[in-house]
Amino acid sequence: MKALFKEEAETRGIIVRVSASYLPEQSEPDRGRWFWAYHIRIENESPVTVQLLARHWVITDGRGGRHSVEGEGVVGEQPLIAPGGSFDYVSGCPLATPTGHMQGTYQMIAEDGSSFDVAIPKFALLAPAVIG
């Protein structure tokens, strides 16, 4: 399963795996718009159930411009993830440059009421012409 995902990070037994894909059909390079989809899997290898409450993304374009995005849950959900369970979702990111990267954190709450941040690994956003 790891082969599907290019990047991963682990915090307190919560593993976040990420893979990004360039979407040429939604991109308009001649208008300065490139678009990627990213697939995230959150796996709970801890002994307690956790709930994802919020997300915080830092998106950096190819010129070094940074944009911060915060919000409740992911794709309209605040999933509960039991020990041994996982949650997958797909979302997208536009940029005004053909390269960039994303990274961030998820705010989680454990069943005992304690909250903690889980790292989302840094992953590259690269348009194919830039790759090679």
Predicted features and spans:
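Terminal connector regions
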Residues: 6, 94-132
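Short glycine/serine/proline-enriched coil/turn segments at secondary-structure junctions
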Residues: 27-28, 49, 96-100
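Intrinsically disordered, low-complexity Pro/Gly/Ser/Thr-rich segments with frequent PxxP/GP/PP motifs
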Residues: 67-99
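Short acidic, flexible loop segments centered on an aromatic residue
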Residues: 48-67
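Hydrophobic core residues within well-ordered beta-strands of beta-rich domains
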Residues: 14, 34-36, 40, 53, ...
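Asparagine-centered strand-capping/turn motif at beta-strand->loop junctions
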Residues: 42-46
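Short structured motifs
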Residues: 2-4, 22-26, 54, 72-77, ...
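Low-complexity, acidic Ser/Thr/Pro/Gly-rich terminal tails and inter-domain linkers that flank the onset
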Residues: 2-33
